[in-house]
UniProtKB/Swiss-Prot annotation:
Residues 27-134 form a propeptide. Residues 1-26 form the signal peptide. One of its GO terms (molecular function) is calcium ion binding. A component of desmosome cell-cell junctions which are required for positive regulation of cellular adhesion. Required for cell-cell adhesion in the epidermis, as a result required for the maintenance of the dermal cohesion and the dermal barrier function. Required for cell-cell adhesion of epithelial cell layers surrounding the telogen hair club, as a result plays an important role in telogen hair shaft anchorage. Essential for successful completion of embryo compaction and embryo development. This is Desmocollin-3.
Amino acid sequence: MAAPGSGAPCAELCRQLLLTLVVFSFACEACKKEIFNIPSKLEADKMIGRVNLKECLGSVDRIQSSDPDFRVLEDGSVYTAHAVVLSDEKRSFTIWLSDTEKRTQKEILVLLEYQKKVLKKRHTKETVLRRSKRRWAPIPCSMQENSLGPFPLFLQQVQSDAAQNYTIFYSISGRGVDKEPLNLFFIERDTGNLYCTQPVDREEYDVFDLIAYASTADGYSADFPLPLPIRVEDENDNHPIFTEAVYNFEVPESSRVGTTVGVVCATDRDEPDTMHTRLKYSILEQTPRSPGLFSVHPSTGVITTVSHYLDREVADKYSLIMKVQDMDGQFFGLMSTATCIITVKDSNDNLPTFRQNAYEASVEENTVNVEILRIPVEDKDLINTANWRANFTILKGNENGHFKITTDKATNEGVLSVVKPLDYEESHQVVLEIGVANEAPFTRDVALRMTTMNRAVVTVHVKDQDEGPECSPEVQYIRIKENSAVGSKISGYKAYDPETKSSSGLRYKILHDPKEWITVNEGSGSLETYKTLDREVITPKNDLYNITVLAIDQDGRSCTGTLAVSIEDVNDNPPEILQDYLVICKGNMDYVDISAIDHDSSINGAPFYFSLANTSPEINRLWTITRVNDTAARLAYQKNAQFQEYFIPVAVKDRAGLSATKTLRVNLCDCTNPVQCRAARRSADVILGKWAILAILLGIALLFSILLTLVCGIVSARNKKAFPDDLAQQNLIISNTEAPGDDKVCSANGFMTQTVNNANQGFCGTMGSGVKNGGQESIEMVKGGQQTLESCRGAGHHHTLDSCRGGTIEVENSRYTYSEWQNFTQPRLGEKLHLCNQDEEHMPSQDYVLTYNYEGRGSPAGSVGCCSEKQEEDGLDFLNNLEAKFAALAKTCTKR
């Protein structure tokens, strides 16, 4: 009985101890007290200040206010829940902070004060507390943005330790005092009380860095200047604003859930990283009002799809009214709206469909490039896009390629055409299966749940037509050997009537034969060689010689076919060495390569076999030839070969045994003077082409034409009068005499002529000269010799005929005979000689020296003789009776 009695008090004690521990664990620990200066009247949702919650309790999951007139946000901002009027100068409430995980609770006492302007008098020196260790230090200070006053609003008091010993006067400077904005702050000179004169906008000025000064009455600085920062506490006075009034986005229809449509963004001018700038996005309204298709992330503003039923054919555009609100979206936060236009882009989610499942068409046989049917389709996708345009395909029935189907871009219809003639005898009708799809591929979801191509059947009826002969196959092949004898028979081209399947009654003609080697039998179509076939003359395509044949029926209808003649090669062309002239520089080159070609086919061509085709022991001793490859050989010389030009015959043989020999001109040169080697090579390589030969012939023809012209001119000149009238014919006569003549007495003997046929002898003739006023005569008697006229004086005219040297003298044939010529000239010459002698006898002697100008060299001609003795006055009587127009000239020429 004792044990239970004693155990009961022990259990009670344990329960009391546990209860005490629980109470102590939840006991509230007080944090730093907060004091706010506020006006006596406050509006609802008005911020009065901010407390530092994290400084009091690191992790807070529950915040409560003891006064229902005030609420506290997560960042410590204290707001009025509704309008508040302070009846007393002071009012307080408690903020409880709880951390349920750590079972910790703390409280913050908030003291609200309403103070009128208090002008504190400066303490007297006796009443000032003396704290010798206190220093002049900055005092933390802040003020509420857009404060309601009363103004001037007391902020704090500034005091210096020097005030214990001196009378101190206070002053401030900085932005808000003597810098813009001016006169926003002032300090009482005696007390150090700092005041603000008007509300401040934090978005314009977030802090004021003032400097406080303490000085004595005589201006002595009692302490160092004190930095005095005044921070402006933010108030939620700015609405969040979207960056754009209207957003435009696009999204493909049938998009998957979660597809990003776009991003909206808003900004808030309030203090960053506070509840005033913590924004939340939401959708207020969607138009058209269909089930919700879009959502927006509350923090990032990303708009996404929440349904895959976006269908452009139902609605191609949606309008969303977007809302953004600060204070983390709480109902008392500030908000603004914007419009978001979302356009649904078309995707290929609708298949083109045929209006009916079966179609029929008809066409006559042998008709091509005709349209036989138009097939319409329907598609709900956006018109004139790749999602709407149809792409038709013939799936079955067009194995022979008779049909083609295209799309009419304007109507989106399928156009079925015949591109290859149909044959009624082969098939009376053709059944086609037509498929249709879009140009753009189908969306994945559509492709998974339905077929991607619709089908329809088209039956084409072929109409019979009376047709002409048919050349089938179009290309027929035959073989014939090269160099076949003229008149060799060849099986010809065969056409037939498709109705009777017979070739009777058809006529054949050759439309095109490149070399006119073949003739055709018009009735049977058999061929016959007209000329010898030479495979190497032409360059056959694919080793075929094509002949175009025309087959004609009795009604004049025709068809055209090709007869491909395969000409079998015959080894009728020996190999040909390409080189003619070769230069080998001895010492630098030990050999030279030569090559050959064969115009025959490969079976009669390479490999070639080269050898020396000379029985001369010297050539065989000095030169060797070896194989390089199938078409080339190497010609080498021995070391003891001399510098000279060698003529080396080389034989080359093809694989079939046909050979040819060519003599190569090889110049073994020391190349010390390469020009000589090259010159020899150039002379050896000169080959006249057809144009050069033509130019030579034209030159020869031109030369003959010039010679013919000269001959004609000479003949015409000989037909003229041999001895013209003794007049100058109003032309100047060149005497080629510039020096004085010899003094000679002209003989009056008769004229004497002599003809000498010997080419080695000369001819001498003497001619008398008479006087004829105003004229000069010259007689040319000799062709091919040289004539010299000696001078005779006679009335200022001189006529001389000297000897003729070296040449055959010929007397021109003319219409005058010799006797006529003598009768014509002898009296006149005798008269002239007589007058010349008389003038010489009556001429006074001139024994004085005559002056002649030096002209650089002596004249090869003789003296002008009696002509130089002519008096100046002779024959000048006409100058005495000059007309008036010559008076000035006469005056100029008269000696003075």
